[in-house]
A protein has these predicted regions:
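N-terminal Rossmann-fold cofactor-binding loop
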Residues: 37-41, 62-63
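Conserved anion/nucleotide-ligand pocket segment
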Residues: 133-139, 143-167
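Short, conserved SAM-binding/catalytic segment
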Residues: 46-55
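Conserved Rossmann-fold cofactor-binding substructure of NAD(P)-dependent oxidoreductases
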Residues: 60-89
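Rossmann-fold NAD(P)-binding glycine/threonine-rich loop
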Residues: 108-130
Length: 167
């Protein structure tokens, strides 16, 4: 049994603060078990004092240090990452989540990186029933809208939808 329901990785980032504030306003510190994580203890304490309360645990880690990431990945059901660029900081995190049966979500708009994740982690995640959910935010809207418009034009001109779209 994992100790936390969700941990926000990158809680001191602009979006991380918004996610932290939302979770606290929606659930407080007792309806679900959650924590915040990032690189800088001072910044995380500031976020916690501004938008949450002192009962929300803090984890410190470095995106390139597996051991520090595992200290919180192993303890939660879900990692919500707001740390980008994801192609630089996210691959190791996703790999460790899949290896440790932890679900993962992010707000990436990096379609090329999502393809890399699918190629590298989809089968193992699927076999373990681990969810990897990318683009859970505003950043995904431009690419989603582009695909939508391309598909509409394909249907109008060629009477069929594109089977795939490379970006």
């Amino acid at each position: 049994m994992k100790q936390f329901d969700i941990i926000i990785w990158g809680a001191s980032s602009f979006t991380g603060k918004l996610v932290t504030e939302y979770l606290f306003n929606k659930f407080g510190s007792s309806k679900i078990k959650w924590a915040i994580a990032g690189r800088d203890l001072g910044k995380l304490k500031k976020v916690r004092s501004q938008v949450a309360d002192k009962n929300i645990p803090i984890f410190i880690a470095d995106s390139f240090d597996e051991e520090s990431l595992l200290k919180f990945i192993k303890k939660t059901k879900v990692i919500c990452s707001t740390v980008g660029p994801y192609s630089l900081y996210g691959t190791k995190l996703v790999k460790l989540c899949v290896e440790n049966n932890t679900n993962y979500c992010d707000i990436t708009g990096e379609a090329h990186w999502i393809r890399t994740l699918i190629d590298n982690f989809h089968e193992e995640a699927k076999s373990k029933k681990i969810k990897i959910v990318n683009s859970c935010g505003f950043d995904s809207i431009p690419s989603d809208m582009g695909v939508y418009f391309i598909q509409n034009e394909m249907k109008k001109i060629y009477k069929t939808y594109a089977k795939s779209i490379k970006m």
